[in-house]
């Protein structure tokens, strides 16, 4: 059973529909007991880091998430769901994350330029990824694939070996992570057309 955590912040229906398009049913739930029973767990997210952590804590989701990861069952984080895996974020202050992957979440500088043009923050739209490691979710995909991003912050892992893909926007940043059973993307697979559907199918196939 694929379970998508509904903690009040995330584009849940589009993620669910993405799985359905590739032949997998996915259950959206706000019940921590259901989350605890998931075979595969998906943590989406949009909004502010602190608000999402507050919602996860208030909803009783933190412990089931940690237990799921520790059990070795597949886990997929999407966008803010990637950032929440990390130790801390500097978004609107200093806030603690789930600390599943050591590292921090930092903001794109406002003065980034490319070929003399000022780059806008948030980073929004299509961008190519460079696959660094053969994460299971990237099976059948190659570097140079375009995916859809919407974010002002990016993750900086303490251990660079967890970086599964990078992208460039004024600087090279981490676009996806992979460590054992934990995979997460800064971009939105559910908005990334055929490439994104392949990622969701690969996760469902695990």
From Swiss-Prot:
Gene Ontology MF terms: glutaminase activity; imidazoleglycerol-phosphate synthase activity; lyase activity
Subcellular location: Cytoplasm
EC number: 4.3.2.10, 3.5.1.2
Keyword Hydrolase: yes
Reaction(s) this enzyme catalyzes, per UniProt: 5-[(5-phospho-1-deoxy-D-ribulos-1-ylimino)methylamino]-1-(5-phospho-beta-D-ribosyl)imidazole-4-carboxamide + L-glutamine = D-erythro-1-(imidazol-4-yl)glycerol 3-phosphate + 5-amino-1-(5-phospho-beta-D-ribosyl)imidazole-4-carboxamide + L-glutamate + H(+); L-glutamine + H2O = L-glutamate + NH4(+)
Pfam short name (any one): GATase
Assigned keywords, A-Z: Amino-acid biosynthesis, Cytoplasm, Glutamine amidotransferase, Histidine biosynthesis, Hydrolase, Lyase
Residues forming the catalytic site: 79 (nucleophile), 188, 190
Any Gene Ontology CC annotation: cytoplasm
Domain Glutamine amidotransferase type-1 stretches: 1-206
GO annotation terms (biological process): L-histidine biosynthetic process
Pathway where it operates: Amino-acid biosynthesis; L-histidine biosynthesis; L-histidine from 5-phospho-alpha-D-ribose 1-diphosphate: step 5/9
Highest rank taxon of the organism: Bacteria
Main function: IGPS catalyzes the conversion of PRFAR and glutamine to IGP, AICAR and glutamate. The HisH subunit catalyzes the hydrolysis of glutamine to glutamate and ammonia as part of the synthesis of IGP and AICAR. The resulting ammonia molecule is channeled to the active site of HisF.
Oligomeric and partner information: Heterodimer of HisH and HisF.
Protein name as annotated: Imidazole glycerol phosphate synthase subunit HisH
Gene coding for it: hisH
